[in-house]
């Protein structure tokens, strides 16, 4: 498994995200999320990533209940939201996405994920279940619960 690192909220992380803005998918940029976190310097960073050498090649935001509005997860008192997981194209199919998911699961808390950019099949292969609901942007909502 690749090492997942906690990314701090600072301009260095903004620079690391640059490759994702250049080569990644617009729906997954996380520009607003990072800028919002930089404004609120007291908040803990929700960003995690995997490096290949000096380059950030995979990333995700992992939010806690209360960080975002919640309507799809009423049966759980506490949970995480897996937000905008992305692996750069040249690094896909090398286990980086799996490593990020495994890291999120290591908290042993239920996880809600929004299936963006054809990620539904990937998430279902990671034991997430389709709750047959869509978020306001029309993306499928999936959940994972520890056994």
Curated annotation (Swiss-Prot):
EC number: 2.3.1.-
Highest taxon, organism lineage: Bacteria
Keyword list, A-Z: Acyltransferase, Transferase
Residue ranges annotated for the N-acetyltransferase domain, each copy included: 7-147
GO MF terms held by the record: acyltransferase activity, transferring groups other than amino-acyl groups
InterPro entries: Acyl_CoA_acyltransferase, YlbP
Protein name: Uncharacterized N-acetyltransferase SH1739
Organism: Staphylococcus haemolyticus (strain JCSC1435)
């Amino acid at each position: 498994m690749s090492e997942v690192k906690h990314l701090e909220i600072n301009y260095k992380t903004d620079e690391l995200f640059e490759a994702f803005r250049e080569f990644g998918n617009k729906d997954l940029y996380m520009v607003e999320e990072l800028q919002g976190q930089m404004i609120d310097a007291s908040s803990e960073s929700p960003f995690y990533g995997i490096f290949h050498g000096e380059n950030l090649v995979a990333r995700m935001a992992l939010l806690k209940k209360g960080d975002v509005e919640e309507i799809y997860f009423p049966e759980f008192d506490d949970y995480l939201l897996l937000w905008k997981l992305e692996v750069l194209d040249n690094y896909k199919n090398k286990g980086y996405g799996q490593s990020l998911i495994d890291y999120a699961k290591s908290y042993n808390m239920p996880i809600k994920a929004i299936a963006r950019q054809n990620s539904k099949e990937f998430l279902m292969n990671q034991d997430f279940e389709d709750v047959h609901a869509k978020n306001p942007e029309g993306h499928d909502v999936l959940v994972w619960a520890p056994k």
